[in-house]
A protein has these predicted regions:
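Beta-rich strand-turn-strand
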Residues: 53-89
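Short aromatic-glycine-enriched beta-strand elements
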Residues: 18-32, 90-91
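Intrinsic-disorder/low-complexity, polar/charged segments enriched in Ser/Thr/Lys/Arg/Asp/Glu/Gln
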Residues: 3-5, 25, 47
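OB-fold and OB-like beta-barrel modules that bind single-stranded nucleic acids
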Residues: 5-12, 30, 66-77, 96-99
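Short edge beta-strand segments in beta-sheet-rich domains
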Residues: 25, 45, 87-96
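Acidic, gly/ser/pro-rich intrinsically disordered tails
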Residues: 1-2, 14-22, 37-43, 58, ...
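Ser/Thr-centric signal marking residues that sit
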Residues: 11, 17, 78, 91-92
């Protein structure tokens, strides 16, 4: 079984490309916080490359934007290609089947944090 569910923030707006027969692809990176802090007491994140096709890509194009907290369900895909130097580059991506809204945007989170601090 190849199934993955991730929750994180979009690092930038999805990049939309169009293929044959008006078939669109949405590509974006999801910053997923690790469940622990590093030695300096800071949270680190993994940056996961994601791609959505067809209806899932249309959803991403219409609704997703930088800073949004979302969850995704999909499958991990690995691949490889040869770069300009002739080296083999290995890739790991998530092929997104579904998107889920989970909360606010980064801007809204900052506003809420400012409100909490001003109440203290």
């Amino acid at each position: 079984m190849n199934s993955v569910i991730l929750m994180g923030r979009l690092t930038k707006d999805p990049e939309i490309t169009e293929g044959k027969d008006d078939f669109i692809v949405a590509r974006y990176t999801l910053a997923v916080d690790r469940p622990f802090k590093n030695r300096d007491g800071e949270r680190e994140a993994d940056f996961i490359r994601c791609q959505a096709f067809g209806k899932a890509a249309e959803f991403a194009e219409t609704y997703l934007e930088k800073g949004m907290m979302i969850a995704i369900k999909g499958q991990i895909r690995t691949g490889s290609y040869e770069n300009k130097s002739g080296d083999t580059v290995y890739t790991t991506d998530v092929n997104v089947e579904q998107h889920f809204f989970t909360g606010s945007s980064a801007k809204e989170d900052k506003k809420e944090e400012t409100k909490r601090r001003s109440r203290r």
